[in-house]
Amino acid sequence: LQEYQRLISEEIELSRLAEDDVNLPAQLKSGERIKVMLNAGLSPEHEEKLGSRIDGIGLYRTEIPFMLQSGFPSEEEQVAQYQGMLQMFNDKPVTLRTLDVGADKQLPYMPISEENPCLGWRGIRITLDQPEIFLIQVRAMLRANAATGNLNILLPMVTSLDEVDEARRLIERAGREVEEMIGYEIPKPRIGIMLEVPSMVFMLPHLAKRVDFISVGTNDLTQYILAVDRNNTRVANIYDSLH
């Protein structure tokens, strides 16, 4: 929790420093325009304030509400949470990442103790092993998206094509369940993965046939390529994404 509070303070300070430039177009010298999207989930009030100045939400960290509660949020609680974000940016894409816990992100009501947590049970590995957690969350996302149609679903810590296939199967199942519940066809979200595991770089041609987009998770990808724990002060000096 302290780490996220620190991140909130950093984001607010960086935004204050960039206030003078925020209304300028994000444009290359060639004239090509670049879309600027927000990493969200830390400060809803701040995100709403920036709404008109950005092109959407590139990453919404759904694990934060999970971490702030004493137990798993219900499907209804999650619907309300995601609906607020999707409606706030209803004419822009919003990318919701499925529950990404483990390693340095722990749930107080689901402690995970491992000798090497960075290489252990985390991200999509947890939610595919506990499919009810995944199904409840995805149903909530799809229900929240029923009226807006601007949802992208992002899968974290993917290590194999089998994980992508299984996640897509569960998302399709959740979609059928939601349609049966509400009685009409719902918009189909775009589905993507976080590219964080080095081996998946070599699987890109196969991934491209299975997903709609790929988001590069530079923090973990750098950590795994360099074999450096970025949170370990003894070796943090050699954690360099430019290497």
PLM ranges: what are they?
Residues 1-6:
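Conserved glycine-bearing catalytic or ligand-binding loops at nucleotide- and phosphate-handling centers
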Residues 7, 11:
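Residues that form generic nucleotide/phosphate-binding pockets
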Residues 12-243:
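Conserved alpha/beta-domain cores
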